[in-house]
Amino acid sequence: AQLVEGSTAKDYQKTETRLNIPRLDYSNGTCPSLLVEPQRTNILKYSEDFENIYWYEEPGNSVTSNTTISPSGIQNADTFTAVGGSEMNIHNVATFPLTTGTYTYSVYLKNNGTNLIEVYLYQIGPGFVAKGEINFSAETFTASIGTGTITNVGNGWYRVTLTNSVTAGDFTTGVYTTSTTGTRSVFVWGAQLEAGSYSTSYIPTTSASVTRNADQVAKTGISSLIGQTEGVWYLDLYATGKNKDGAGYATWLIAGDSSNNFQIYNIGTTLYWYAKNTGGVLIDQTANQTLVEGERYKIAFAYKAGDYALYINGVQKRTSTNANVPAVSQFNLSAEGYGASPVIVKNEYNAVALWTTRLTNTQLAQLTTI
């Protein structure tokens, strides 16, 4: 027996204990990245079934199910259509409560003859609290309330997102256009509303909200695999993640505990390298590298008593002659904090490796060249 999220069966995975399968993201090409994300809940129900009574079509509007191939590769995307003098407006049939906080609404859209389509988050009383418009021909998404993003996911589909902070109240989400001329139509799939200041990967729902657990990449008790006097930590990743508050990309690597550790982390768009042992902080410096969201970075953190170096994309960024080396026996990827339950942040890793000897500077440059 097997239970999976969504309305479609997946290939059977034999298990004797809990599955421990990494999630892979192919959006950056044919070679996948390891996707690491925090726990999130899709608050919206029937996220792919807009004909369900959970959704409401205003007079003059209609929804036709399963009319075209969605980003999932299955023919399960719906068509929204408005005719006559009616505005297109399809939204939740009933409001739902949200507590005070920051939320992100996302939905997948594909052009079906109407170039300008708007999406929104609406609060009873104040009105629109997040609102934006996609221009299919220009491949842009402009937020008039809140902040927005657009991602081309292929085959004419775009994922648009809206983010804003709200006060507690009752809300609804929707897709609409103010045009009342002719027939207006758009393909729609995969609606999601989640608490947080950025969107995470799509979580399908049916009759109830669904929570996806955090992806934790960690290992303890491996002092024999980590160089205790010298070595190299290596990361190859895309700067696509955010920290728990959304302000930047947060910790990319943390090896060790609160007394002895190596870290690669950021504050905003500034990257840092850090080392500490029981005697105190050894290194805490900027990496002379401004981060650009969506860019790829290859990073090598080399350490040895009196011979530290940091290389990024083939260039030596920092050195240190500190004579001390942290003794570590564990590591976490994309986590803020130590121990078994750190706060997970979002990142996409192409490769992670470590060496128990310090590579030469020439080797570090070659290793990190893109």
Where are these predicted regions, by residue range?
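Extracellular glycan-interaction surfaces
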Residues: T67-F96, Y103-S179, V186, G190-L193, ...
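Parallel beta-helix/beta-solenoid repeats that form elongated, surface-exposed shafts/blades used
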Residues: S33, N260-Y265, V281-D284, P342
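Flexible glycan-contacting loops in extracellular carbohydrate-active proteins
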Residues: D170-T180, S185, S320-E348
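Extracellular glycan-recognition surfaces and repeat-rich motifs
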Residues: P22-P32, I53-T79
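GGW-centered surface loops in extracellular recognition modules
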Residues: G6, L19-E48, G169-S197
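Extracellular, beta-strand-rich glycan-interacting domains
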Residues: A1-A9, D49-F50, L109, R184-S199, ...
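Extended recognition patches within non-cytosolic domains
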Residues: L3-S33, E194-L225, K317, N350-I370
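Extracellular glycan-recognition modules
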Residues: R40-S47, I53-G60, S86, P97-G101, ...
